[in-house]
């Protein structure tokens, strides 16, 4: 879950 959430945050940045 956290692993999937990390890429999403980086993508927004």
From Swiss-Prot:
- Name where it mostly resides: secreted
Q: List residues modified as Leucine amide.
A: 13
Gene Ontology process terms (BP)? defense response to bacterium; defense response to fungus; innate immune response; killing of cells of another organism
- CC per GO annotation: extracellular region
Source domain of life: Eukaryota
Which family is it part of?
Belongs to the MCD family. Crabrolin subfamily.
Protein name (record):
Vespid chemotactic peptide 5g
Species per Swiss-Prot/TrEMBL record: Vespa magnifica (Hornet)
